[in-house]
Amino acid sequence: TRLVGSEMCIRDSPQGYRLSKVAKRYLAGLLKYAPEFCAITNQHVNSYKRLIAGGEAPIYLSWARSNRSTLVRVPGYRPASEDACRLELRSPDPSANPYLAFAVMLAAGLAGIEEELELQEPNEDQDLFMLSRQDLRQQGIATLPESLGEAVELFAESELMRATLGDHIHSYLVAAKRAEWNDYQGYVSQWERDRYLAVL
């Protein structure tokens, strides 16, 4: 996601990661609303087999410059190369519809600007993958949904997602994804057969 324009340029002091106030609020919006748009950026059951603690994909609602366990990265760049600055939201997978994904990501960032959200401190030095659930709670670090079912319900309850996509598309996606999740829950996989049939 690139922010452009005189007010949105990312060119503050290095202490601020060269993020303007507007950029920080945009990033705060991404972090706040990521759980609500996860059903769009990660739309299938198997998407959540990638979004697991200790995996390569980030699930923790935090940000940093080089910490691979955070949801958003703000890679460094040379002071004279402001155009190279960017925010990297690292959770979307290739199955996402790019039009819907960009719509909800932009809406989340713009909501952060409109709500004047304060950006949390970056998490540079901690390997969040190594923290227990209790540690995460104590530090106030939330996570993305753990399943498609959880993601769909957060999406269904989101006023921002409904306003962004419109009632018709929002309701259709909720119904379709709930049906997909219900089908999956009733399916007995080969792994379950191999694991449990012999001990019954």
Where are these regions (language model features)?
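Catalytic-core signal marking the mid-to-C-terminal active-site face
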Residues: 12-200
